[in-house]
UniProtKB/Swiss-Prot annotation:
This is ATP synthase subunit delta. The lineage of its organism: Bacteria, Thermotogati, Thermotogota, Thermotogae, Thermotogales. F(1)F(0) ATP synthase produces ATP from ADP in the presence of a proton or sodium gradient. F-type ATPases consist of two structural domains, F(1) containing the extramembraneous catalytic core and F(0) containing the membrane proton channel, linked together by a central stalk and a peripheral stalk. During catalysis, ATP synthesis in the catalytic domain of F(1) is coupled via a rotary mechanism of the central stalk subunits to proton translocation. This protein is part of the stalk that links CF(0) to CF(1). It either transmits conformational changes from CF(0) to CF(1) or is implicated in proton conduction. It is found in: Cell inner membrane. It comes from the Bacteria. One of its GO terms (molecular function) is proton-transporting ATP synthase activity, rotational mechanism. Belongs to the ATPase delta chain family. F-type ATPases have 2 components, F(1) - the catalytic core - and F(0) - the membrane proton channel. F(1) has five subunits: alpha(3), beta(3), gamma(1), delta(1), epsilon(1). F(0) has three main subunits: a(1), b(2) and c(10-14). The alpha and beta chains form an alternating ring which encloses part of the gamma chain. F(1) is attached to F(0) by a central stalk formed by the gamma and epsilon chains, while a peripheral stalk is formed by the delta and b chains. The keyword Electron transport does not apply. It is a peripheral membrane protein.
């Protein structure tokens, strides 16, 4: 997904403030929830007849005490500038940008079936040793792998899946036949 300049400006501003008040993760969760609320009640939030203060109050009521003044101000700014259609993009981009700001690394792990907590911990420790950063693992299931995993991080791909090994063997056999 390509993120707009508008989204990145809002994300960078919220990250800067979040870092100062040590709430980067909290704001990420709030943005995710805001995105869910926005998508569910899009017609209400996009209605120009509804005043900004009413939209913000609705969000404050739905979030209860979990929302702080900084985040309320952020939401107000988004609605005042009529940028609410960017909320899903802002939420998605914030997630990835916050990983970088916190000096973590995104790790995509594709497996044939869901990994156990021990397997995830082993992958996490392996990645941490390789790049000396805390990994944030995103799991994806692809039954065509048969077994094993494909691990991607820092532009590297480690394929320890059965289908990957079978493909490698097939390439070697075909190269022998041609040679």
């Amino acid at each position: 997904m390509r993120y707009s300049t508008i989204s990145s400006k809002y994300v960078n501003a919220l990250l800067m403030v979040g870092k100062k008040v040590n709430k980067i993760e909290d704001y990420g969760e709030l943005l995710k929830a805001l995105c869910d609320v926005y998508v569910q009640f899009k017609d209400f939030f996009d209605n120009p007849a509804v005043k900004v203060w009413k939209k913000v109050e609705t969000i404050k009521e739905s979030f209860g005490t979990s929302i702080d003044k900084v985040f309320v101000n952020f939401v107000s700014l988004v609605f005042e500038n009529k940028r609410q259609k960017f909320i899903p993009q802002i939420a998605a981009y914030y997630r990835y940008a916050s990983i970088d700001v916190e000096n973590k690394i995104l790790v995509n792990v594709t497996t044939a079936e869901k990994l156990s907590s021990e397997e995830l911990r082993a992958i996490s420790e392996f990645v941490k040793k390789c790049v000396n950063r805390v990994p944030v693992i995103e799991e994806k299931i692809d039954e065509s792998l048969i077994a094993g995993a494909v691990i991607e991080f820092s532009g590297k791909m480690i394929d320890v899946s059965v289908s990957g090994r079978l493909n490698k063997i097939a390439r070697e056999v075909f190269s022998l036949r041609k040679g």
